[in-house]
Amino acid sequence: MALSSIEHYLSYHLRVLLPQVLSSKSSHNIAYIFALFAAITSGFVSLISLYAQPWQEHLSYSSWQINMIVTVINMGMYLTPPILGIIADIHGPITLSLSSVLGFIPSYAYLAYTFHRDHSFTNESDGSFTPTLVCFFIIGVATSGLYFSALITCAKLFPGTKLLSISIPTTCYGLSSLIGSQFLRVKYFHPVDYPYLDLGRVFKAFAWIYTVIGVMIWIATSKVAQIQHEADIMEEQDRMAEPSDNDVENHYDDNEQSRLLHATHAQQMTLMKVFRDPVLYIFGATIFCALGPLEMFIANMGSLTNVLAGGHEPAMSSALLSIYALTSTLTRLGTGLTVDYFNKRQLSVKWILLLFLVVGLVTQGKIYMLSMSSLDHSHMVTINRKLFYIGIMQGIAYGGLFTIYPTITLMVWGEKMFGTAYGTLMIAPALGSALSCLIYADVYDSECANSTTRSCIAPVYETTALEFCAAILLTVVVTVLWRKRRTHI
């Protein structure tokens, strides 16, 4: 497909410049490396779990406000992929990358400015909290846009190998939390006059980082446009070299038009079949119940750690996020390998899904038991060890489920309908995380704000445990319905 006018103008200068300064192979490899850097930085929004303390102490945000921020981020990330996919298909990944950078830079610059203002002017009553929500919604959309742009770029640069096109960029995205949490340990972000993370400096640094990333992904996506443009030229030359006959050509055009109309009608019928499939929505309900609590854990990791550890381990949140991110990334890779093994052995991958759901359920029980335990501050080593194990188990559940759900979607609805089906299903974690985060905020603000006991948070994990039980039950129902349809997973 020829370049759109937007993709043509955005990539024109680099398409002209790259062949003059780099060989084709060098520009190809550099573009891939730049796309991986974009994939790594696209996930920095997950560091929000480290922002709870400065938001609460410096800006006097309540847990409800913090979870509202998390909710709008998830809405931006999960509700827009179908639209972003259409834009990328029509106008290329360069359009997504430019839009993402234009979303990141001013949003983070504004957030840095508001954090450094006097906290007396940052209360919700003066209306400044609403622009903050708008900024984080834009950041959520930009996160999906930059990640999609990087992923599509890698896939187009190395379409022949799943390792380079899918696995490595996906792994880089999973490493965002780990790399970002280590980056925020730099002393620059912890000035002596701040007893907590200076989010003004953090957000300002992010604005500069995304400026650099914007240049890098512009180069990478322009290389993709160059490859497409060269392919279009070769196709045009081949077509002009063929002998022409007006009658044959007209007959061919009529048949081609008829074929395209038939294909369009068939595609519309297939789309309607997907949207009318009740099993799709039951499957979406399992995602709603499972991924909602896991997203909530990431968002509230800082405040949860303070509640469970009594606020005596300020470095625990960062360490917990690091181990969580590492475990999640390794699980994503391991799950992909396990799925390949199961497919070769003709084993059902539903057992992998059920295993991760059980791990998630057990983890909710572990958090509940720790919240109800009688361990005091003299047992901090034991408490920290339990939190460490909880972080590992949550990472396994999160990484595994976020890998197995799209895999099953691809197996059931096929490659042609994958984007439509999975884009629809991605609404579920957005709604699920919104519900779970607001439940957490309500319990935290009403029970834990003035409490010194960790049991105040227990009602949240009674609810999340029930959600995982529902997810397991609905998964069994879905697999039975698929078996009746002779759909094997």
From Swiss-Prot:
GO cellular component term of the entry, any: fungal-type vacuole membrane
One Pfam family cited in the UniProt record for this chain: MFS_1
Keywords, ordered alphabetically: Glycoprotein, Membrane, Transmembrane, Transmembrane helix, Transport, Vacuole
InterPro entries per the UniProt record, alphabetical: MFS, MFS_trans_sf
Residues bearing glycans: N123, N450
Keyword Cytoplasm: no
Localization per record: Vacuole membrane
Mode of membrane association: Multi-pass membrane protein
TM annotation in the entry: 30-50, 68-88, 92-112, 132-152, 163-183, 202-222, 279-299, 307-327, 351-371, 388-408, 421-441, 462-482
A Gene Ontology molecular function term of the record: transmembrane transporter activity
Entry function: Probable transporter.
Family: Belongs to the major facilitator superfamily.
Protein name: Probable transporter MCH1
Organism, as annotated: Candida glabrata (strain ATCC 2001 / BCRC 20586 / JCM 3761 / NBRC 0622 / NRRL Y-65 / CBS 138)
Gene that encodes it: MCH1
